[in-house]
Amino acid sequence: LNDENGEKMEKMSAIGAFEGIDITNSKALVDLKLDKPTAKDRDLLVEVTAVSVNPVDFKVRQGLKKSETPCVLGWDAVGTVVEIGEQVTDFKLGDRVYYAGEFSRSGSNQAFQLVDDRLVALAPSNLSDAEAAAMPLTALTGYELLFEKMGFIPAENANQGKTLLIINGAGGVGSIAIQL
């Protein structure tokens, strides 16, 4: 296939689903060859090096209606910026980044992913790719719970005198909420 300029499109590997069939079915998740996307506007093109699997991945896949177009799942990822859209100012080629993607775009279970630069941060240098990939969605959920839903203030000493008990905080969100 050729792009809008008549140039041959580079292909990349991905894993996707065409419908929400039982996960034990050999066609529940399939290997794909997709066109490698190109960054424009506020996009970063990230070469994905690690992803995490969240409950949302299972729920979205289970709810898929049969389609001719595959759904590439995955929201949390770590990778290296390999291309930058013309409106991006905060990142450069080679940056190691992490992010939680968005539902309106293909997910992180692919070799290269387009991500809006406003959803991206530099990955912590003290974490491996796998460790950093486990952070974005759980950290956002924990943050939103504490500071947007429960009314705590995200500033040093702003919550003195307030008490919060987190029971069974052993999962991703609970672990982050305890640390926040």
PLM regions and their residue ranges:
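NAD(P)H dinucleotide-binding glycine-rich loop of Rossmann-like/cofactor-binding domains
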Residues: 100-168
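Short, Lys/Arg-enriched N-terminal segments with co-localized hydrophobic residues
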Residues: 1-8
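Short structural boundary motif marking the start of a folded domain
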Residues: 8-15
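N-terminal Rossmann NAD(P)H-binding glycine-rich loop of SDR-like oxidoreductase domains
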Residues: 170, 178
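Residues forming the Rossmann-fold NAD(P)(H) cofactor-binding site
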Residues: 175
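Conserved hydrophobic/aromatic beta-strand scaffold that supports enzyme active sites
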Residues: 31, 36, 78-80, 112-114, ...
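NAD(P)H-binding Rossmann-fold N-terminus in SDR/SDR-like oxidoreductases
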Residues: 54, 172
